[in-house]
């Protein structure tokens, strides 16, 4: 019997800080359509994500997945590193 977890959100972003132990800050860019003017606007969101083995460095493109609360600010965890050292 395998436990199926609910739909977990996944995002792709770039690591902008790795100065904390087992934690990275990931910047995620989204294009959102303005409801009135119908113009696409770039929105940036930053997440603190758990990096258990401290493998991520600044500039890495990573995939993060939603998880249970790990601390006051951490609700995401690094799933995999997609590219190393992407230029910001």
Swiss-Prot record:
The gene is rpsQ. GO terms for molecular function: rRNA binding; structural constituent of ribosome. NCBIfam families: PRK05610.1 (NF004123), uS17_bact (TIGR03635). Part of the 30S ribosomal subunit. Keywords: Ribonucleoprotein, Ribosomal protein, RNA-binding, rRNA-binding. PROSITE patterns: RIBOSOMAL_S17. This is Small ribosomal subunit protein uS17. InterPro entries: NA-bd_OB-fold, Ribosomal_uS17, Ribosomal_uS17_bact/chlr, Ribosomal_uS17_CS. It holds the Pfam family Ribosomal_S17. One of the primary rRNA binding proteins, it binds specifically to the 5'-end of 16S ribosomal RNA. SUPFAM superfamilies: Nucleic acid-binding proteins. GO terms for cellular component: cytosolic small ribosomal subunit. Gene3D superfamilies: Nucleic acid-binding proteins. Coiled coil: none annotated. The keyword rRNA-binding applies. GO terms for biological process: translation. The keyword rRNA-binding applies. It comes from Syntrophotalea carbinolica (strain DSM 2380 / NBRC 103641 / GraBd1) (Pelobacter carbinolicus). Belongs to the universal ribosomal protein uS17 family.
